[in-house]
């Protein structure tokens, strides 16, 4: 924002006052709240003298007080048929007697958060996750066992309530969370990001955090998965905004605060930069599991998983050679290599100048073999017909299978995305605070 922030706040308050006098209370409330945000920004970045700051702060309190009265009035309008609220008169104690379930604001926030509930299971099983056996066992211990054998977790033996998955990008942290959502059949799975919990309205973000945890407690057993948790819970410092500080405080209170019973609720966080997490947040993640770059055996399994049922002629020796050549690559990097190699046959079809007739399965009925399919070939090949892919009928193309040379070509053009410096930082964090997976 520029130096016109204070003027913008004054303009908004002027409009809010006009709407207030015209008894358009909903619009007035919105404008008051918006104006307060601009005033707060002006206090922080534009007002240089203490006297100016104090003057703006006093005005802020006045408009906030009016906004609260309007909010209470609107909340109780339908139920109690209240008369328009006077500027210097409070609403009385009608709102105190409201039950939580009848609170329309709370209901609206909870409906907004219900969009974070994963209703359809992702269909990713533990077997689909290559390697990471330690992380899988820890998640089974925290999620699956308490649901299946609740009698095991009584007395002092309680399941973990906070698990942090950290490691370089592309190592499978979010993929593991999808596997948890699939395998935890009876759990409600909330998948939230910073955008689900951030609001431009003053005070609404922390209410969203509080309501998220209340929803999770209502639907337990439940799992709250927060991807890129560092964007919400970074270290507290004097340069951060007041809103960010309040969100962090609410997270701390809800995860392990007085009066909050989180039995049956697991908070699962994932981050690539764990060293920026606030120390109090880090403590609340009782298990901190390092998700490293995949080892050779896991990389070989990844190549097999990503190739799937696509036609190829790679042998086990080829797969192990590829695994050896991809030291330092993440699971996401390997996925990109395989996807690119699967496109190589398509590129051969596009660039081919000659095709030849071959025998292969029919497109309409794979059990029937036909001998008039066309596949790309070199110009010197016996039976080569000069034509381009545009001349090939749609149901007569037999694409080449993926071969080792396709894989090596894709590998040569794909570099690992994990930076050596970041890897050292993650390993240092793991040595200080983590646990090997």
Swiss-Prot record:
Predominant localisation class: membrane
Free-text tissue specificity from the UniProt record: Highly expressed in testis and moderately in heart and brain. Not detected in spleen, lung, liver, skeletal muscle or kidney.
Region (Disordered): 75-106
Localization annotation: Late endosome membrane; Midbody; Cytoplasm, Cytoskeleton, Spindle
Protein's GO biological process: autophagosome maturation; autophagy; endosomal vesicle fusion; endosome organization; intracellular cholesterol transport; late endosomal microautophagy; late endosome to lysosome transport via multivesicular body sorting pathway; membrane fission
Pfam families attached to this UniProt entry: AAA, AAA_lid_3, MIT, Vps4_C
Domain MIT residue range list: 2-80
GO cellular component assignments: ATPase complex; centrosome; cytoplasm; cytosol; early endosome; Flemming body; late endosome membrane; lysosome
Keyword DNA-binding tagged: no
PANTHER family: AAA DOMAIN-CONTAINING, VACUOLAR PROTEIN SORTING-ASSOCIATED PROTEIN 4A
Similarity-based family: Belongs to the AAA ATPase family.
Name listed for the protein in its UniProt record: Vacuolar protein sorting-associated protein 4A
Taxonomic lineage: Eukaryota, Metazoa, Chordata, Craniata, Vertebrata
Protein encoded by which gene: Vps4a
């Amino acid at each position: 924002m520029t130096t016109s922030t204070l003027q913008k706040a004054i303009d908004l308050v002027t409009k809010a006052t006009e709407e207030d006098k015209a008894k358009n209370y909903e619009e007035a409330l919105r404008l008051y709240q918006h104006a307060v945000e601009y005033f707060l920004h002006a206090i922080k970045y534009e007002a240089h003298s203490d006297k100016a700051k104090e003057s703006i702060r006093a005005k802020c309190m006045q408009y906030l007080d009016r906004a609260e009265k309007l909010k209470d009035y609107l909340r109780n309008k339908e139920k109690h048929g209240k008369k328009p609220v006077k500027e210097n008169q409070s609403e009385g104690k009608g709102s105190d007697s409201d039950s939580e379930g009848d609170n329309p604001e709370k209901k609206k926030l909870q409906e907004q958060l219900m969009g974070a509930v994963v209703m359809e299971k992702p269909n990713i099983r533990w077997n689909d996750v290559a390697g990471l056996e330690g992380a899988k066992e820890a998640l089974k211990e925290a999620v699956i066992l308490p649901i299946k054998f609740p009698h095991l977790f009584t007395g002092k033996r309680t399941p973990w309530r906070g698990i942090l998955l950290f490691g370089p990008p592309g190592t499978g942290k979010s993929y593991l969370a999808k596997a948890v959502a699939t395998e935890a059949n009876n759990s409600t799975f909330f998948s939230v990001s910073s955008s689900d919990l951030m609001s431009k309205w003053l005070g609404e973000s922390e209410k969203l955090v509080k309501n998220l945890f209340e929803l999770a407690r209502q639907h337990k057993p439940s799992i709250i998965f927060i991807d890129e948790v560092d964007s919400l819970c970074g270290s507290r410092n004097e340069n951060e905004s007041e809103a960010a500080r309040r969100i962090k405080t609410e997270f701390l209170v809800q995860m392990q605060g007085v009066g909050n019973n989180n039995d049956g609720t697991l908070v699962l966080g994932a981050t690539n930069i764990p060293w920026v997490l606030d120390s109090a947040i880090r403590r609340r993640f009782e298990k901190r599991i390092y998700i490293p770059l995949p080892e050779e055996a896991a990389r070989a399994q990844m190549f097999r998983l990503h190739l799937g049922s696509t036609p190829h002629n790679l042998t086990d020796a080829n797969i192990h050679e590829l695994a050896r050549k991809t030291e330092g690559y993440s699971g996401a990097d390997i996925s990109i290599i395989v996807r690119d190699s699967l496109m190589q046959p398509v590129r051969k079809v596009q660039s081919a100048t000659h095709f030849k007739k071959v025998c292969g399965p029919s497109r309409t009925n794979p059990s029937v073999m036909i001998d008039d399919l066309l596949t790309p070939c070199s110009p010197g090949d016996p039976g080569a017909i000069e034509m381009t892919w545009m001349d090939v009928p749609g149901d007569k193309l037999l694409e080449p299978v993926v071969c080792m040379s396709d894989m090596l070509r894709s590998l040569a053009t794909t570099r690992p995305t994990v930076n050596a410096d970041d890897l050292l930082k993650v390993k240092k964090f793991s040595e200080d605070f983590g646990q090997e997976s």
